[in-house]
Amino acid sequence: MQAARGGAGRPERPGRPGRGPERERERPPGAGAASPCAAPGLPAGGATIHPGSPSAWPPRARAALRLWLGCVCFALVQADSPSAPVNVTVRHLKANSAVVSWDVLEDEVVIGFAISQQKKDVRMLRFIQEVNTTTRSCALWDLEEDTEYIVHVQAISIQGQSPASEPVLFKTPREAEKMASKNKDEVTMKEMGRNQQLRTGEVLIIVVVLFMWAGVIALFCRQYDIIKDNEPNNNKEKTKSASETSTPEHQGGGLLRSKI
């Protein structure tokens, strides 16, 4: 009855199979009716899957591809990023503050620096960013006395940040030790000042004594010259007086002669 009913209503066209239970069984389970607007060769969802596209690869192959692309991008970023700062040192170390300084390579073009500070064996991190191309130092404040800290420095450019520098470990002194060293320095400076004053006084005394001796010697030489110049005159006067006493004159103007 079904065959006769289907054949009597519509004659089958040549080259077009009839639609029957056998045709419905050929469709995969779960596939809906194809849209009349769908392009030929597309599945019912409208997405085209090529055999060579990554979406058709196994999950492990796609994960390996993502990992490789990530490594390539990271390598490109690292190639463009600046080098890590060098010669990182900590100076002006006090109980609650310090100053970290560094250098960069001459060919590097940076727009700022990032300083990370943390306590040793503690995960808490302090991040300081300095947007200044000329600065090569940064002050660390609010430090705890007698505590160890670790400092890293990074250079910042347009391409990104550089790798972190070599870690620098330093320890803040105690306040009592700082005061003791300060008092010791003050005592040393006072002693040096006193010694300097004593040395200055001794030098002044020596100079005054030398000037006095020079004056005495000059006065003695002057007096000696005067005495030496007066000696011939004294000799002449003595000779003249001696001659006058040995040859007395006569009252009449003649010399007295002794009688034999």
From Swiss-Prot:
Q: Which UniProt keywords apply?
A: Cell membrane, Glycoprotein, Hormone, Membrane, Peroxisome, Secreted, Transmembrane, Transmembrane helix
Q: Specify residue ranges for compositional bias: Gly residues.
A: 251-260
Entry keyword annotation includes Phosphoprotein: no
May I have one GO cellular component term? endoplasmic reticulum
Induction trigger = Up-regulated twofold by muscular exercise at the mRNA and protein level; this effect has been suggested to be mediated by PPARGC1A. However, up-regulation at the mRNA level upon exercise could not be reproduced in another study.
Ranges of Basic and acidic residues compositional bias? 10-28, 230-241
Gene3D superfamilies the record matches: Immunoglobulins
Report the residue ranges that make up the Fibronectin type-III domain in this protein.
Answer: 84-175
Expression across tissues is: Widely expressed, with highest levels in heart. Very low expression, if any, in colon, pancreas and spleen.
* Biased composition range(s): Low complexity: 29-56
- What glycosylation sites does the entry record? N87, N132
One Gene Ontology molecular-function label: hormone activity
Annotated transmembrane regions = 201-221
Locate the motif Microbody targeting signal: 258-260
Residue ranges for the region (Disordered) are: 1-56, 230-260
Q: Which GO terms describe its biological process?
A: positive regulation of brown fat cell differentiation; response to muscle activity
The protein's site described by Required for dimerization is found at R126
Q: What is the effect of changing R126E?
A: Abolishes dimerization; probably prevents inter-subunit salt bridge formation
InterPro entries from the xrefs? Answer: FN3_dom, FN3_sf, FNDC_type_III_4/5, Ig-like_fold
Q: Provide the domain comment.
A: Fibronectin type-III domain is capable of forming a continuous intersubunit beta-sheet dimer; dimerization may thereby play a role in cell-cell adhesion or signaling.
Looking up PANTHER family in the UniProt record yields: FIBRONECTIN TYPE III DOMAIN-CONTAINING PROTEIN (PTHR14470), FIBRONECTIN TYPE III DOMAIN-CONTAINING PROTEIN 5 (PTHR14470:SF1)
Q: Give the protein's recorded name.
A: Fibronectin type III domain-containing protein 5
What organism does the UniProt record list as the source? Homo sapiens
